[in-house]
From Swiss-Prot:
Annotated S-S bridges: none
Protein name: Transcription elongation factor GreA
One function term, GO molecular function aspect: DNA binding
Protein encoded by which gene: greA
Record keywords, A-Z: Coiled coil, DNA-binding, Transcription, Transcription regulation
BP GO terms, sorted: DNA-templated transcription elongation; regulation of DNA-templated transcription elongation
Organism: Streptococcus sanguinis (strain SK36)
Pfam short name (any one): GreA_GreB
Domain of life: Bacteria
Protein family per UniProt: Belongs to the GreA/GreB family.
Length: 160
């Protein structure tokens, strides 16, 4: 069975690698130490510190596993390989909802790099899916769970 690939920029992959290193070299040892301390309190059946530390350990190990998978199956996308005015991962897109005057700017990233607060939208998000492959001047229909709307692509540029 073919594994899912995770399209991302080189910068996104490097960020994931740093996050993984932090989890393995800092967070994991901290949790192991908390488990040791909690064990020293005696009876584990009513030891809330032990339970909390074990829960945190499971969470950290899950994050490590997820990051290792994303890094292992990362597909580095070179935005220079697509047309200058074509929307792709690694591009910054300025759009305007049809019938509205406000412009919105988004950076298209792989799912691992999505951060709505920083204006980074995943290629798998409704807006990302609608914009990928379109060019400056095109209109795209964004399909959301609550309905659809059209946006006009005003500008596409390489993200710095």
């Amino acid at each position: 069975m073919a594994e899912k690939t995770y399209p991302m920029t080189l910068e996104e992959k490097e960020k994931l690698e740093k996050e993984l290193e932090e989890l393995k070299l800092v967070r994991r040892p901290e949790v192991v130490e908390r488990i040791k301390i909690a064990r020293s309190y005696g009876d584990l059946s009513e030891n809330s510190e032990y339970e909390a530390a074990k829960d945190e350990q499971a969470f950290v190990e899950g994050q490590i596993s997820s990051l290792e998978t994303k890094i292992r199956y990362a597909e580095i996308v070179n935005s220079d390989a697509v047309a200058k005015d074509e929307v792709a991962i690694g591009k910054t897109v300025t759009i305007q909802e049809v019938g509205e005057s406000e412009e919105e700017v988004y950076i298209i990233v792989g799912s691992a790099g999505a951060d709505a607060f920083a204006g980074k939208v995943s290629n798998e998000s409704p807006i990302g899916q609608a914009l990928i492959g379109k060019k400056t001047g095109d209109t795209a229909t964004v399909e959301t769970p609550v309905g659809s709307y059209d946006v006009k692509i005003l500008k596409v540029e390489k993200t710095v």
